[in-house]
A protein has these predicted regions:
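Nucleotide/phosphate-binding catalytic cleft detector across ATP-hydrolyzing
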Residues: 1-154, 173-188, 200, 207-305
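A contiguous pocket-lining binding segment that forms or flanks enzyme active sites
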Residues: 196
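Ser/Thr-glycine-rich phosphate-binding loops at phosphate-binding pockets of nucleotides
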Residues: 159-165
């Protein structure tokens, strides 16, 4: 079975699921947890507290265990959880890191032997037969890339958890010589807002409060706290655009497609900005995973032909 996983610093996304990139480890099975994975004699549950940012996600087993959760969720979505399954895995990396980390990322997931674990007390054995690695951002627009061919130059801007990744398309084809990554994602903004709200309003808030305010959801936060959150988010969006201009990414003369959860949060500010002449948005936060799946399906079809 082919399964696509987008390993974000803030969230893990598959074609049908997304969850925070957070783990809690337990020496015994936690009695109240409704989703438990047992691997190598340890018990793991998903946590709302995301892992610290890491450029290289292969340095320990954390993202492999998160991937086991993702695989189990997708297998459960497809039907009754099988006792054994052969897996082809489609994953991605930021364009700027793609050339450097692609082989290492592939080797991290492709195990020579079967992997045994239990998901919600159901034993499973999987064999990851192959791993396909693709550039983020480009994957998100892969299903509609034919519609972008008429643009001589177009920037893909993926505002994610920790980074903002930029890729230039020339007549619909990625220019891998022009890919940039800025450490200006949603996590950096949230950390700044949490500090600011604490200093100005003597109140402790979390990432979920910020997301709810920016998405227009109901909260019990005071009006002045909401105002601080909105103004801070607008400033962060402006800072991203200013930094892009320093990298010679001028969105007054080139159209842009904005991707990622951050783009959804900042959409109102980006559309109103005089620094952006023409913008479209891919609002599905699972878009990269959907793109990985589509590209891997095409690659597998060629291999099997």
């Amino acid at each position: 079975m082919l399964i696509a996983v987008d390993h974000g610093n803030h969230a893990i996304k598959t074609v049908h699921h997304n969850f925070v990139s957070g783990l809690a480890q337990h020496s015994v099975r936690p009695p109240m947890a409704d989703e438990v994975l047992e691997y190598k004699g340890e018990y793991w549950t998903l946590s709302g507290q995301r892992l610290p940012y890491r450029r290289d996600k292969t340095r320990d087993e954390s993202f492999f265990i998160l991937t086991l959760f993702a695989i189990a969720k997708e297998l459960s979505y497809a039907g009754p959880l099988p006792a054994a399954e052969k897996i082809e895995l489609a994953v991605g990396l930021p364009p700027e890191h793609y050339g450097i980390l692609k082989d290492k990322f592939r080797a991290y997931f492709k195990r020579s032997e079967s992997v045994q674990f239990s998901y919600n007390d159901k034993p499973m054995t999987i064999l990851i037969r192959d791993v396909f690695v693709y550039p983020q951002a480009f994957a998100a627009i892969a299903p509609q890339k034919s519609q972008l061919k008429h643009h001589l130059r177009l920037f893909l801007i993926d505002i994610g958890g920790y980074t903002t990744d930029v890729l230039l398309l020339r007549s619909g084809k990625p220019d891998m010589q022009f890919c940039r990554s800025l450490e200006t994602g949603v996590i950096t903004m949230n950390n700044d807002i949490i500090r600011r709200v604490g200093a100005l309003h003597d109140m402790q808030i979390e990432d979920e409060h910020i997301s709810a305010v920016l998405r227009g959801k109901e909260t019990i936060l005071p009006a002045d706290v909401k105002d601080t959150i909105r103004k801070s988010a607008e400033q962060h969006a402006k800072d991203i655009l200013d930094q892009l201009r320093e990298l010679k990414v001028d969105l007054r003369s080139n159209p842009a497609v904005f991707i990622g959860g951050g783009s959804v949060l900042f959409r109102d500010y980006l559309e109103r900005s005089p620094l952006v002449a023409s913008a479209s948005f891919v609002e599905n936060v699972n878009a990269n995973a959907i793109g990985y799946q589509a590209m891997a399906e095409g690659q597998l079809s060629l291999l099997r032909a």
